[in-house]
From Swiss-Prot:
HAMAP family: PurH. One of its GO terms (cellular component) is cytosol. Pfam families: AICARFT_IMPCHas, MGS. Pathway: Purine metabolism; IMP biosynthesis via de novo pathway; 5-formamido-1-(5-phospho-D-ribosyl)imidazole-4-carboxamide from 5-amino-1-(5-phospho-D-ribosyl)imidazole-4-carboxamide (10-formyl THF route): step 1/1; Purine metabolism; IMP biosynthesis via de novo pathway; IMP from 5-formamido-1-(5-phospho-D-ribosyl)imidazole-4-carboxamide: step 1/1. It catalyses: (6R)-10-formyltetrahydrofolate + 5-amino-1-(5-phospho-beta-D-ribosyl)imidazole-4-carboxamide = 5-formamido-1-(5-phospho-D-ribosyl)imidazole-4-carboxamide + (6S)-5,6,7,8-tetrahydrofolate; IMP + H2O = 5-formamido-1-(5-phospho-D-ribosyl)imidazole-4-carboxamide. This is Bifunctional purine biosynthesis protein PurH. SMART domains: AICARFT_IMPCHas, MGS. Belongs to the PurH family. Keywords: Hydrolase, Multifunctional enzyme, Purine biosynthesis, Transferase. CDD domains: IMPCH (cd01421). One of its GO terms (biological process) is 'de novo' IMP biosynthetic process. PROSITE patterns: MGS.
Length: 521
């Protein structure tokens, strides 16, 4: 039964209302510093911890709750007579509810003008100590670290005579240990990122010790293949607009492959300003287009490779209206992603309940790092977020691209970044015409891309081609020109660049170099 609570919070969201409700249930309130003042100003009967322990706060507040009367009241097991006798002998009442959240360390180090001294002062000591004590003794103590749990605790107390059940206490305790682990992980990441000068502004993006924190969203039916188990986890600091923020409107449970392909589709479609549609199969774009609206973008994207689009993942960067929904509904689709769906569009898909509809708000930001597991280790790199600007391009051929060709080249280059290497992409008029992906030789990717276009009945005459990396020989260039391309965009950087440029001049096509490679594995 909860008779006494200790409240000490940095995030004061909802704390006054929570404390009022506790007081109304007859719970005695203990508090510290700014929290105690806030509660007292709200007219609540609150006892300062310093008055409770008989020992004043000291060292600029560094020592205030580190006292036996606090930790004894938290850690004592109520089912052990010797524990309760010890409390009685020393005049220590039990503390049955602990409400604590920690100094804002992560928010502090996110500031550009943060100093090491600022960071150190925002490392909480008393808070984690109390939290861990209460979480360890969760059979007897309810511990709350998240304001979102205030209502849960109050509801149980009101329903059960000021008592919170063991299952709830256990869940709250696990939340505490996850929170303190993440807190300590953030501190370690920061301190081990500092260089010899210990300056905030020159810290290493890759700390000596890297701690990552993810919360489980759901267990999955299986992994990449049916014999593999799997689960989906969300980054505790999920950036706005990330796939992990999806809201599923209808459809079956997402699979491992659904999530992986959906991420590829969403990341690609977000890069376009005009209404765009991306169709993904096995993490590769098989159709990408922009149009006047979602419906036109889809119609153009689907033309690229209708065969591969079967059972694909489709993403839009605009609301899906009824017209677009009716077009998509004619095909077999696994997942459809958009910032929103009109009510009419939802009605169209209501008749196709197996189609998974995901809403994700378009937003800025992306994952801080790209991670790849290897045997016994982890590769960590910055995200490939480079989008080349026209002024950064270098025309290396005698013929310059026309304005239309330049538009097509930039579109093709944007798509190529999301195609598995080796990647060759034919484009024209705001749509992909042929995609060659994942081949061990660039010339084979070029051949496959042209064959794909032929199979779809699309002409490559006057098309633009993007290559995610340089042409090591002229053979790949010869293939795309023979297929009908009149301009090419590629990074350059080969020892045979001169040979490839000479071949382009021989064919009288335009070639531009970006100086940026987009390998994707």
């Amino acid at each position: 039964m909860i008779k006494q609570a200790l409240i000490s919070v940095s995030d004061k969201t909802g704390i006054v209302d929570f404390a009022k409700a506790l007081s109304g249930l007859g719970v005695k309130l203990l508090s510290t510093g700014g929290t105690a003042k806030l509660l007292a100003d709200a007219g609540l009967p609150v006892t300062e911890v310093a008055d409770y322990t008989g020992f004043p706060e000291m060292l600029d507040g560094r020592v205030k709750t580190l006292h036996p009367k606090v930790h004894g009241g938290i850690l004592a097991r109520r089912d052990l007579p010797e524990h309760m006798q010890a409390l009685e002998a020393h005049g220590i009442p039990t503390i049955d509810l602990l409400v604590v959240n920690l100094y804002p360390f992560v928010q502090t180090i996110a500031k550009d003008d943060c100093t090491l001294a600022d960071a150190i002062e925002n490392i909480d000591i008393g808070g984690p100590t109390m939290l861990r004590s209460a979480a360890k003794n969760h059979r007897d103590v309810t511990v709350v670290v998240d304001p979102a749990d205030y209502a849960v605790v109050l509801d149980e107390m009101k329903a059960n005579g000021n008592t919170v059940g063991y299952k709830t206490n256990f869940r709250l305790a696990t939340k505490v240990f996850a929170h303190t682990a993440q807190y300590d992980g953030a501190i370690t990441n920061y301190l081990t990122s500092l260089g010899d000068d210990l300056q905030h502004g020159s810290r290493n993006a890759y700390p000596a010790t890297l701690n990552l924190a993810f919360d489980k969203v759901q267990d999955l039916r299986y992994g990449e293949n049916p014999h593999q188990s799997a689960a989906f986890y969300r980054d505790v600091a999920t950036p706005a607009g990330a796939l992990a923020n999806y809201r599923q409107l209808q459809g079956k449970e997402l699979s491992y492959n659904n999530i992986a392909d959906s991420d590829a589709a969403w990341e690609c479609v977000k890069t376009f300003d005009a209404p765009a549609c991306v169709i993904i199969k096995h993490a590769n774009p098989c159709g990408v287009a922009v149009g006047a609206d979602a419906g036109e973008a889809y119609a153009k994207a689907f033309q690229t490779d209708p065969t591969s689009a079967f059972g694909g993942i489709i993403a839009f960067n605009r609301e899906v209206d009824e017209v677009a929904a009716q077009a998509v509904a004619k095909q077999f689709v696994e997942v459809l992603i958009a910032p929103s769906f009109s009510e009419a569009a939802k009605q169209v898909f209501a008749a196709k309940q197996n189609v998974r509809l995901l809403e994700i708000a378009l937003g800025e930001g992306h994952n801080a790092f790209d991670l790849k597991r290897v045997g016994g280790g982890l590769l960590v790199q910055s995200l490939d977020s480079k989008n080349v600007q026209p002024r950064e391009l270098r025309v290396v051929t005698k013929r310059h691209p026309t304005p239309k060709e330049m538009d097509d080249l930039l579109f093709a280059w944007r798509v190529a970044k999301y195609v598995k290497s080796n990647a060759i992409v034919f484009c024209g008029n705001g749509m992909t015409l042929g995609v060659g992906a994942g081949q061990m030789s660039r010339v084979d990717s070029a051949r496959i891309a042209s064959i794909k276009a032929q199979n779809a009945g699309l002409t490559l005459a006057g098309s633009a081609v993007a290559s995610d990396a340089f042409f090591p020989f002229r053979d790949g260039l010869d293939v795309v020109v023979a297929a009908g391309a009149t301009c090419v965009i590629q990074p350059g950087g080969s020892v045979r660049d001169d040979e490839v440029i000479a071949a382009a001049d021989e064919h009288n096509i335009a070639m531009v170099m970006t100086g940026v490679r987009h390998f994707r594995h």
